[in-house]
Amino acid sequence: MSAPDPAGPPREARRARRSSPGQLWVAAVCTALFAALTITVLTVDGKRPLPGDQALHTWALTHRPDALTAAARTLADSGTGLWPYLLAALAGSLAGRNARERTVSAVAALAVLLLGQGLRQALMLAIARPRPPHADWATHASGFSMPSGHSTTSALVAGLACWAAAHGARRILRWCVWGLAVVWAAGVGLTRIYLGVHWPSDVLAGWLLAAGYLTALAAVTGGRVPVACAPFPANSRQRRHLRTRDMG
């Protein structure tokens, strides 16, 4: 095993800081699809629902028994309010290896979520798409329709959970977290269609926005835990090396 590079951070850390072409391509594709969907909605007279929107909306209205509607409301509630921020902070804390790293990672995860929320809010106000008719709603909703706030928020939190699991969990636990996070985010988004407060294209826009934003951020930062850029060695072997170098 090669010794740490005395001239700077270890080679692994320098490689982690490089942008991933794959992540950049995913971010570009998601951004392009989001832009195409937004332009399509804006060019429709009155920002009316797209053909697929109306068909799925009508299906939801005719398949809403009380039990499923109540369950959908409960699941949707987990994607708004304080819950997403608590989950994001928890995900960030799990990515650290000690108290300091857990604190910094939790704050970084919250910052990523808040920045994403600000971007979503700005786009929602700029697009200003009306929601489905109020008579079709089976829950409370506010604001404009696109992109869906619940869908974007839950997808952002799911992405942060997947990032945390990739850095701080064993393989089996990692796959469990990834699966649960994706299923939860998808479920929250679908409830917004089922409850009649969003068009399907609103939910798709939220997913695309979250995916594009997170993959672009991961490409820029190398997807590393934020504390990796701090001037402290990542492990005891590197700390011993620096202590020896300083004594010399």
Residue ranges and their predicted role:
Residues 4-14, 19-21, 91-101, 161-169, ...:
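Structural signal for the C-terminal ends of transmembrane alpha-helices
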Residues 23-30, 88-117:
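Interfacial segments of alpha-helical transmembrane regions
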Residues 36-38, 114-120, 183-193:
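Aromatic-anchored segments of alpha-helical transmembrane domains
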Residues 67-68, 100-105, 133, 171-176:
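Membrane-helix interface segments
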Residues 108-112, 116, 120, 206, ...:
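Alpha-helical transmembrane segments in multi-pass membrane proteins
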Residues 1-83, 124-138, 245-247:
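N-terminal transmembrane-helix/juxtamembrane module of multi-pass inner/ER membrane proteins
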Residues 136-248:
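Membrane-embedded catalytic cores of phosphoryl/pyrophosphoryl-handling enzymes
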Residues 114-122, 147-152:
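Mid-bilayer segments of alpha-helical transmembrane spans in multi-pass integral membrane proteins
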